[in-house]
Structure formats: C-alpha cells, structure tokens
Amino acid sequence: MAPDFPWLTAIIALPALSTLLIPLLPDKEGKTVRWYALIVGLVDFALMCFAFWQHFDPQATEFQLAESYRWLPSLGIQWSVAVDGISAPLVLLAGFVTTLAMFSAWQVNQRPRLFYALMLLLYSAQIGVFVAKDLFLFFLMWEIELIPVYLLVCIWGGKRRRYAAMKFLLYTAAASIFILVAALALSLNLPGGPNFDLGAIAQQDYPLGLQMWLYAGLLVSFGVKLAIFPLHTWLPDAHGEASSPVSMLLAGVLLKMGGYGLMRFNMELLPDAHVRFAPLLVILGVVNIVYGAFSSFGQTNMKRRLAYSSVSHMGFVLIGIASFTDLGINGAMLQMLSHGLIASVLFFLAGVTYDRTKTMVLAEVGGLGQVMPKVFAMFTVGALASLALPGMSGFVGELSVFVGLASSDTYSATFRTITVFLAAVGVILTPIYLLSMLREMFYTREMDLSCDLGQPTNVAIAGNAPVCFGNDCVLPSNAIYEDARPREIFIATCFTVLIIGVGLYPKLLMQMYDAKTQTLNTSVRQAQAIAKQPSEPIAALQAPELTMPH
C-alpha cells in the first residue's frame, strides 16, 4: 500500500464497521461471533503494528501518520487524526489488551452478538481517543466510549451491575462537560475563527487566567477517568460488578485515557497553568498511592482489592507528570503502559478463578494452589509484577518516577523528602495486601480433621480428604476445580512475556516516547522559567473573557 494510505482512519473504522456484519452471522450461541470478533481484533492490531513499523519515527516529536478531512468546516471541525510519541504506545496497548480481552470472553453465552459488537465499538472509540488531533473529535470519541462500557457493565455484570454502570456513566459524563467547555474556549480564542486543531491550539499563547480555569476543569475530567482521589469511587464498584473482560479494559485502557489527557492537554496546551498546578498533582499522587494501598486491606472482594491497587498505582502517573524531569515523565508513561499490562492479566486471572469457584469473596476460597497450580503460578507472577519486583515492568516505571521527583530542582528538599517517604510507604504496603490476597486464595489453611463434616463450604481442598477450617468443612465433591486451560495459559503468557520483556529491556517501549516527553518537559520548563510571582495564580483566577468570532 502507498505511504499515504489512511492508516489511522482504517484502524478506527475496521472494528466499528465490522459490527454491521455480526447480525448476519449464522449461529446465535456465539461460537462464530467470538472467532469473528477475535479475527477482527487481530487484523486491526496487525494494522497498527505494520503502520507504526513502516511509518512511525520515534525520534520525531511532531504528529505523524496525520490525516485531515473536512467535516464541519463552518465550525472549524475536521476529521483529523495523527499519532506521536505519547499516543502511539497507548494505541498499541489498547489494541493488545482489547484483542486479548475478547479472547478471554469465551465463556460469555448471554447475548454474545451484542457483547462482541459492543467490544468492537469500544475498540474503535478507544483508538479514536488516542489518535484524535481535533479537540471536538476527541470529545466525541470520549463520549462514544461511555456507551459500550455502560452497557457491558449493565448487562453482563454482577448483582449490583445497574448501580455500578449508572455511577460510572454519571461520573464520566458529568466530568466530560469540562472537556467540551475547554475545547470551545480554546478554539474560539484562536485568531481567524473557531479551530479545534491541536497543532494550532498548541501554538497559541493563552492568558494565564483562562489557562488556570481550563486546567482545573480538565483536571476534574481526566481525574475521574484516572481515578484520582476523591473522584475514584466509581472504579471499585465498576470493577466489582463488571465481567473480567470488561475489567481488563477498564484497568488496562480506560484509566490510561485520563493520564493521556493530562499529558496531551494540561501539559502540552496549558503549560503556564501546569507550572502552578504541579505541586497539587504531586500531593494528589501521594494521596492516591497511600490511600489506595490502605483501602485495599479492607476489601474482601478480590476484584475490589485489585481496583484499589489500580488507584494506588495511578498516583505514580500524577507524580511523574508533575516532576519537571525527563526521567519522571518517562516514568509516568512507562507506569501507564506497565500497569495496563499488569492490571489486565490480574483481572483476567481473577475471572479465571471466579469461573471455577463462583465467588469473588476471599474468605470463601482457600487452598486453591494445590488444586489449580497453573492458575496459582500465573497469579503469583502477576502479583509480583504489580508489587514492582525488579526485572518486571512495574519496577522500572515506579523507580523512574521516584528518581525523577527526587532529582527535580523545582521543589524544595523538604517537600521532595516528605513526598518520596510517603510514596515509599505506599510501595511497602503493596506486597502486604497483594501477598495476603495470594495467601487467602491459594495456600491451604491449617486442617483439623476432627471437626464435623456436616457443613460444606466453597473452600477448595487438596487431594481427596475432607478439609476442615475451624467448624467449616469441605467435602471432596466440592473441590473438583479445573486448572487453567490452554487458552487461558496462552492469554496470561502473552501478558507475562511483555511484562518481563519490558522489565529487562525498558528501552523497548521508552524509545517510542522519549523524544516527545523531552519536548513536553522542555515546554513546561520554559513556562516555569518565565512564570510570574507565586501570588499571581490567585489573582489570575478572575473569570476570563472569551473572544467570540464575528
């Protein structure tokens, strides 16, 4: 194909247009549609890999693979898509996780056609968010993504699925209003009339007052998606009720939209305001790390514990973005990509465990390691990656953020010391709540064979003998659990190979965005150098005047 082939448009359109053929597929049980959706996902992911391999230059800092088509010219709206160093890796992450999430959904037998149609539509919307070069198009893709997620949680979720789905919708839809307001304010203040193009907006110097107000609004919008405290409460509910394939997308891709938005809009378009808000981001990041870690201890539901773990890990993204160092911003990007892989495999394995035990309550399982050794081994690797074991991707991302903040000359030594210390407390807590979860799930508890055998529970046993925990005993028939199937081993292996590969050779991903993050940091450092007195941000919060086109 010619180099000017519309790669990104094709990548966005393929999954969405493929849903039109799903009603024509022959079977209603889902055997055909699941393979159809998987093939579409694989083809789309292959298109991404080929397009970036052939036409993406990681050393270039400008937009690449750019396409622009007139859509609503009178309003300055175009179908404009492109990628650069911070969007291309996230596009690949979305394609990788979504394809494997569809492969993991083999057990879905309730309305499978609708399920896979929504998964493919979500696939397109996710890619659209990361490649949109037009602010209005970004907002449109951001809103489209809400619809399939809401339906996927509401229809295929747990007992409280409607509550969780509605909470997610209300939080995200309400917060996204600020994205629309920011898009209108930035485009209407450009010379020559409304223009939603990111390149044109990035070249414009906006008044500090306008930047401050828009930054605050966008921080709320992206903070909801990134699960920043106290805007995070939708996440544990959504994870607790969503099916595991949907949880993989919530943790692996949707959370990253918030981090991407902060880097793309708050940092790149509003650098003067970013300088003023950066200390707040660091504080919020520390709160996320510590609060998420402590909250995980009190969770009896496996997926809710993993959800609060995600809240904790997203704190490193905030700190890295506000570090004013190349290493810290690189660490924030790597943390997003690494967490996307690690959280996805953990939620997948939580689903594998639920398929056998039919419970997410940690107190109702135990001793699974002896009857499901393969699941135990895979879960252990995922947990070790999540607690940032050296040699795995999580370690490199978190270490880069720590060193980046500690070496930043923007903050005082006292501020840096306190921040690093508190963040380290959260890091220390991570292995405690993760390893305790593994102990509850997989290690056989102390057996008492003298107890009454009349009370069977949902706890697994080892071998053929009854197992008693206090007054609760398990009969042998209750403990027949199938170990991991080849499909499940393949999915977990795909994630594990990347997690270890990036941990051992982080340049594999960092080379894609290093040049771009350096450019971002240079721009905010320049804004920092010309920043006015510290008292001015407060005065700058006077309501700005918007220039309306004649």
Swiss-Prot record:
Function: NDH-1 shuttles electrons from NAD(P)H, via FMN and iron-sulfur (Fe-S) centers, to quinones in the respiratory chain. The immediate electron acceptor for the enzyme in this species is believed to be plastoquinone. Couples the redox reaction to proton translocation (for every two electrons transferred, four hydrogen ions are translocated across the cytoplasmic membrane), and thus conserves the redox energy in a proton gradient.
Compartments, as annotated in UniProt: Cellular thylakoid membrane
Keywords: Membrane, NAD, NADP, Plastoquinone, Quinone, Thylakoid, Translocase, Transmembrane, Transmembrane helix
Protein name: NAD(P)H-quinone oxidoreductase chain 4 3
NCBIfam families for the chain: NDH_I_M, PRK12561.1
Entry annotated with the keyword RNA-binding: no
Organism: Picosynechococcus sp. (strain ATCC 27264 / PCC 7002 / PR-6)
Source species, domain of life: Bacteria
GO CC terms of this entry: plasma membrane-derived thylakoid membrane
Catalytic activity line of the entry: a plastoquinone + NADH + (n+1) H(+)(in) = a plastoquinol + NAD(+) + n H(+)(out); a plastoquinone + NADPH + (n+1) H(+)(in) = a plastoquinol + NADP(+) + n H(+)(out)
Any Gene Ontology biological process: ATP synthesis coupled electron transport
Membrane topology type: Multi-pass membrane protein
Predominant cellular place of this UniProt entry's protein: membrane
Family as reported in the entry's similarity comment: Belongs to the complex I subunit 4 family.
EC numbers: 7.1.1.-
A GO term, aspect molecular function: ubiquinone binding
